[in-house]
Structures are given as C-alpha cells and as structure tokens.
C-alpha cells in the first residue's frame, strides 16, 4: 500500500497544471532500479524462441537491444521524466514453459531515480518479443487469444547516498 500523501504530488502546480519536478538542489546519488514483467506465449512459440526458429531472427538478442535503447530514451517518451545519465543496464530473460520473463536493472548516478527507465526497458523489451513472434502467435482470425503482457512492476529501488 502506498504511503505517499496525495497532497504532496509534485508533477502538478497548485492550479493543476503539469510541471516537471525541480531536482536541481538534490545531491548526485548512486541509484538502481529493477523492474520485470512476463509475456505469455503458446508452448510452440516458446519452443521456437528456444530453438532460434523464429524467421525474423534471434528474438532475445533483438529484444535485449530494444530494452536497452528504450531505457536510454525514456525521457523522450514519458513527458515529466528527466534525462538522466545511464551508467549501466542489465537485461535478463527467463524463458519458461508458457512465458518469457524479462528483468531490467538500471543504474545511474544523479538527482532522480531510474525506475521509469527500468519499466520502459521491460515493456519495450517484451513488446519486441511480441513483435518478433506475432506470426506464430496469431490464431486463424489474426487475433492473439493467449498472448499477454502481465505482471509489469518495479521489483526494487535503491539509493546509495555518498559518504
């Protein structure tokens, strides 16, 4: 359950207008955020991903590049995100019997956190997987009845103040 105070929302002015938070007076701090999510796929699609049998190419390698690129460009797609110096991105895929799980860990040293970057990496990485396998996932009507992105969230967020 969130413990934030609704009266303390920082992305709006007193008049309700959107604004970017001023982080200029905050000290540079080492920060890390980890996010993850799942993409449910048919068993036959999972087998093709494992066997590098998708015609578009290596699914996980392409998704890894997409996830990393998304992390680096988060500030361009989420209006109130600051452009932050990304110092590291780790992507980990776990191909299970019925899903691909993606975990993205992002590190920065700066004045604001990197959880939005981690989330952007997860969602884009999973979207890339979906794009790569969509021909295998479509049913006879061109729909995706069993394909779904789920469980996207921030797993951990860390801040290490300088000593």
Swiss-Prot record:
GO biological process, one term: Mo-molybdopterin cofactor biosynthetic process
This enzyme's EC code(s): 4.6.1.17
Catalytic residues identified in the record: 131
Xref: Pfam families: MoaC
First-tier enzyme category under EC: lyase
Pathway connected to this protein: Cofactor biosynthesis; molybdopterin biosynthesis
Region of interest (Disordered), residue spans: 1-23
Catalytic reactions of this protein: (8S)-3',8-cyclo-7,8-dihydroguanosine 5'-triphosphate = cyclic pyranopterin phosphate + diphosphate
Gene3D superfamilies, A to Z: Molybdopterin cofactor biosynthesis C (MoaC) domain (3.30.70.640)
Role noted for this protein: Catalyzes the conversion of (8S)-3',8-cyclo-7,8-dihydroguanosine 5'-triphosphate to cyclic pyranopterin monophosphate (cPMP).
The protein's assembly and partners: Homohexamer; trimer of dimers.
Family membership noted in the UniProt record: Belongs to the MoaC family.
Name listed for the protein in its UniProt record: Probable cyclic pyranopterin monophosphate synthase
Record organism: Halobacterium salinarum (strain ATCC 700922 / JCM 11081 / NRC-1) (Halobacterium halobium)
GN (gene name): moaC
């Amino acid at each position: 359950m969130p413990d934030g105070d609704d009266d303390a929302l920082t992305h709006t002015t007193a008049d309700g207008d959107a604004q970017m938070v001023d982080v200029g007076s905050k000290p540079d701090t080492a920060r890390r955020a980890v996010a993850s999510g799942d993409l449910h796929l048919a068993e036959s699609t999972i087998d093709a991903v494992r066997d590098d049998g998708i015609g578009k190419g290596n699914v996980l390698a392409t998704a890894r590049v997409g996830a990393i690129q998304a992390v680096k460009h988060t500030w361009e797609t989420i209006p109130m995100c600051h452009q932050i110096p990304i110092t590291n991105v780790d992507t980990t895929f776990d191909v299970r019997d019925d899903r691909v799980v993606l975990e993205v860990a992002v590190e920065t040293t700066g004045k604001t956190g990197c959880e939005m970057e981690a989330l952007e990496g997860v969602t884009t990485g999973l979207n890339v997987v979906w794009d790569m396998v969509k021909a295998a996932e479509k049913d006879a009507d061109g729909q995706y009845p069993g394909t779904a992105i789920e469980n996207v969230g921030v797993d951990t967020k860390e801040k290490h103040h300088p000593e």
